[in-house]
C-alpha cells in the first residue's frame, strides 16, 4: 500500500518510521498485524491512514475497545495533528468524554438531525444535548 501512496522510496521509509515512532509501534514493526491486540491494530490503522498526509481524516469509533492509556495517547495525537499538521479530523464516537477531550467543536445527532453544536464546554450545558444524550449528571473536566 505504501508504494502506491508514496512513490519516493526514501521519503516513504522516513514517513513510515515517523508514524511508527509517533504511534509508539517501534517494538511491533516486525510482528504481523493479525497478532496485534485490538488497541495496537487501531493505532496501526490510524497511522496507515496518515501515510499520505491527508488534509481531512475521518475516524469512526476510534476510542472503542481501547484501554485508558491508549485513549489518552490517541487524544494527544489527535490534538497534535490538528495543531501541528493543520489536519481536519472528523470523529464519530459514542464515547463522549473521550471525544470531547480532544475536539474544538462537537455535534450531537438525534434521529439523523444535528440538535446541538458547540465547543465541548458549552455543549455539555446545552439543554437539547442534555435531554438527548448527556443527561443531568454528566460531568466534563
For each of these PLM feature ranges, what is it?
Residues 32-36:
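Conserved ABC ATPase signature
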